Design a protein with these regions (language model features):
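TRAFAC-class small GTPase G-domain
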Residues: 1-188
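C-terminal-of-GTPase-core extension/linker across diverse P-loop GTPases
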Residues: 182-202
Length: 202
């Protein structure tokens, strides 16, 4: 992200909905985003993550990007104040646990829910990013989920972006957050956030 300076402010917050099976790492991921602010890409977290509270939703992140300043408001399925199906997200983030194939298989159902609740009219109406969490737990052995497989699934689910990271170690967290911010910003432009030509891997 760019250094602070004179930027045009986007007044309306950009709403992001984080979906994924229970236990896939959503809460730790959101908490980790708070810890990486100001860190350089590739650096590791120096302090333990302090978990956010579900009752504090939406989780707010102030962004400076592409000479613009804007606010991300992120919700997940554990929001006790408002059921996620009643939201009107600008971007959907589909999350799974890289060490748990069941959570990867569950994304098909979540993607169907996105179409059911948020798609209006013909064609895709909302940008979707898929993110693999707990990257530090990817171990060789039976059931190993390779990046090539997850990219293929992201394409099959018609996602616009794919990224993976580890909130615990901080690996690729900055890159994943920047890509999410970029996708969110694109929803405020005439082009929108949908990717032409398929899923982009970060």
């Amino acid at each position: 992200m760019e250094t602070p300076g004179a930027r045009e402010a986007i007044e309306t917050p950009i709403t992001i909905l984080l979906l994924g099976d229970a236990g896939c790492g959503k809460s730790t991921f959101l908490s980790g985003l708070k810890c990486i602010r100001g860190q350089k890409p590739g650096s590791s977290l120096k302090e333990p993550i302090e978990l956010l509270h579900d009752t504090d939703q939406p989780f707010v992140y102030e962004i400076n990007f592409s000479k613009k300043s804007f606010t991300l408001e992120i919700y997940d399925t554990e929001n006790p104040n408002q059921h996620w199906t009643t939201l009107q997200p600008d971007v959907v983030l589909l999350a799974f646990d890289i060490s748990n194939r069941k959570t990867l298989d569950g994304l098909k159902g979540w993607r169907s829910d996105v179409i059911r609740y948020f798609q209006q009219g013909e064609g895709e109406r909302i940008p979707v990013m898929m993110v693999g969490l707990k990257r530090d737990l990817r171990k060789p052995g039976e059931g190993l989920i390779y990046p090539q497989e997850t990219y293929r699934i992201a394409q099959e689910l018609r996602c616009d972006r794919y990224a993976e990271c580890s909130a615990v170690t901080g690996e690729l967290m900055t890159q994943a957050f920047e890509d999410l911010a970029r996708l969110a910003y694109m929803t405020t432009t005439a082009e929108g956030g949908q990717t032409k030509g398929g899923c982009v891997v970060m």
